[in-house]
């Protein structure tokens, strides 16, 4: 199997029948909700979690990554934060707190199995702030 074949091979992956999409339950002070993620590619050595701007924007403008990350062999994850895109949309203003969003990123990271040896955060605008705050409060540092 060539490099390209291995990159696109989803056999044995729980999300293989959904095109890489899955919903992840997250716990908040207002109860349990779910957020949407989508995996692209297959690389156990390098995984990138993409954090969109906003809050309230969606992952869609980050789909430009489809133009270059696959060619580099990078496994990456789109993710709509709570209250945006395909994720749950709770009507609770108290959930719009920076610390709560940082905790959400940690819950998503853990559910996706992203560890300190293979995990990079890419954040744009608000997502960049989340990435910085995650790095400052995380029990491990990401690359």
Give the ranges of each region predicted by the language model.
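N-terminal type II signal-anchor transmembrane helix
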Residues: 1-6
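N-terminal cap/lid segment of alpha/beta-hydrolase-fold proteins
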Residues: 9-34, 39
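Tryptophan-centric aromatic hotspots in well-structured domains and transmembrane helices
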Residues: 18-20, 78-79, 126
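Conserved HGGG/HGGXW glycine-rich cap/lid loop of the alpha/beta-hydrolase fold
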Residues: 28-89
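Structured segments of extracytoplasmic/periplasmic soluble domains
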Residues: 68, 108-111, 137
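Active-site loop/oxyanion-hole signature of alpha/beta-hydrolase fold enzymes
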Residues: 84-122, 126
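Conserved hydrolase catalytic core segment
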Residues: 116-143
């Amino acid at each position: 199997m060539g490099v390209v074949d291995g990159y696109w091979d989803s056999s044995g992956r729980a999300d293989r029948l959904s095109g890489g999409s899955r919903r992840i339950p997250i716990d908040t002070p207002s109860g349990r909700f779910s957020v949407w993620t989508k995996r692209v590619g297959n690389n156990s050595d390098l995984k990138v979690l993409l954090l969109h701007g906003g809050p309230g924007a969606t992952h869609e403008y980050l789909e430009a990554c489809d133009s270059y990350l696959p060619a580099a062999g990078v496994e990456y994850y789109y993710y709509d934060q709570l209250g945006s895109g395909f994720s749950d949309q709770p009507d609770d203003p108290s959930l719009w707190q920076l610390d709560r969003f940082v905790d959400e990123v940690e819950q998503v990271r853990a559910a996706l199995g992203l560890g300190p040896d293979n995990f990079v955060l890419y954040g744009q605008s608000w997502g960049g702030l989340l990435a910085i705050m995650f790095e400052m409060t995380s029990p491990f540092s990401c690359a």
